[in-house]
From Swiss-Prot:
Protein name listed in UniProt: ATP-dependent Clp protease ATP-binding subunit ClpX
GO cellular component, one term: HslUV protease complex
Self-association state and partner proteins as the record states: Component of the ClpX-ClpP complex. Forms a hexameric ring that, in the presence of ATP, binds to fourteen ClpP subunits assembled into a disk-like structure with a central cavity, resembling the structure of eukaryotic proteasomes.
Annotated residues for binding of Zn(2+): C13, C16, C35, C38
Pfam families: AAA_2 (PF07724), ClpB_D2-small (PF10431), zf-C4_ClpX (PF06689)
Location of the ClpX-type ZB domain: 1-54
Entry-linked HAMAP family: ClpX
Keyword vocabulary terms for this entry: ATP-binding, Chaperone, Metal-binding, Nucleotide-binding, Zinc
Keyword Nucleotide-binding found: yes
A Gene Ontology biological process term: proteolysis involved in protein catabolic process
GO MF term set: ATP binding; ATP hydrolysis activity; ATP-dependent protein folding chaperone; protein dimerization activity; unfolded protein binding; zinc ion binding
Gene3D superfamilies in the cross-refs: 1.10.8.60, ClpX chaperone, C4-type zinc finger domain (6.20.220.10), P-loop containing nucleotide triphosphate hydrolases (3.40.50.300)
Amino acid sequence: MFKFNDEKGQLKCSFCGKTQTQVRKLVAGPGVYICDECIELCTEIVQEELAKDEEVEFKDVPKPIEIREILDEYVIGQDNAKKALAVAVYNHYKRINSNSKIDDVELAKSNIALIGPTGSGKTLLAQTLARILNVPFAIADATSLTEAGYVGEDVENILLKLIQAADYDVEKAEKGIIYIDEIDKVARKSENPSITRDVSGEGVQQALLKILEGTVASVPPQGGRKHPHQEFIQIDTTNILFICGGAFDGIEPIIKRRLGEKVIGFGSEKKNAEVNEKHVLSHVLPEDLLRFGLIPEFIGRLPVIANLEPLDEDALVDILTKPKNALVKQFQKLLELDDVELEFEEGALIEIAKKAIERKTGARGLRSIIEGLMLDVMFELPSRKDIEKCILTRETVANNAPPKLVLQDGTVLDTKTSA
């Protein structure tokens, strides 16, 4: 029988045998002792077992309006894209719940194409959807993919990322979401099929066809290239939702040409082109994607096309302040942990938005701009106990002037004089 104490009379954990001096806590029960380390280990084991037993249920998928409302909390603007995504996602998981058949009518899968400029929110929309639905989510970069037989990443490695996101629970992964970014970069270089092989373009599209439509794929557990005598993970992609996003730079002239507008013109025609410039992507059709360089079979696997508009100054200011995880709120929280209040003046927010537009980075570039502005302040403040408030002004952003620092006695300093 296990002894509860050693020769020196110290109490021991009944499970691991460590003495009370070797652990932080020893909990006593009827005729038994357990240490904090064993409690933590047991908790992890139970949680893992419970997670395995949980079946992936999608009976409570939010309605499209509810999905849209949650997206509004994290993503500013892009109303048309949100509506299209909400409907497509709801129908996708409704299709899964119906076991793909209703009265012998087979419901086809509706993968999604997201078209919009860099930093307009494509990746964030896909990530937020996965969070809403509580499903595994993986991001892949189309530019790293090549067709089988060439140096590069096999398309099956996309599926491995999803399996890893599901903690290697294949059944759970089979109902996840995969976002393939930069899909426009695998467009073939010409509308006409090339005689020579296009390793980075059409070949990748061909390789993606099967997994987009639905197939049982063999995935190497460790990633990399397949080789003989290797064990594979079998995963059915029929119920995986694929969202393919890209900026599709250069598609606007194709759309305008189809709409009968001249790409280069004078007078009223030029004025019309300028008026419609912001909304030209809202007119995109599958035939435009074909002319851009996607093959017909690939376009057919993406029946839902949602476009995102370029973000203007007002939208970028809203992105800085309104979402639940807005950047301004994040930086305010960071300084709050050092007992300092952070304030962004309205003029500063407008200048930050202008810089992002100038750099053509959209919302993606906002964080790097603020990080640059806050570097000196965040370096100095943790060592200062007399600072109560930090104010970023328009001059701070536009002319690299130091932020205002307010001392606890009300004195206003700048970073140059506060050292």
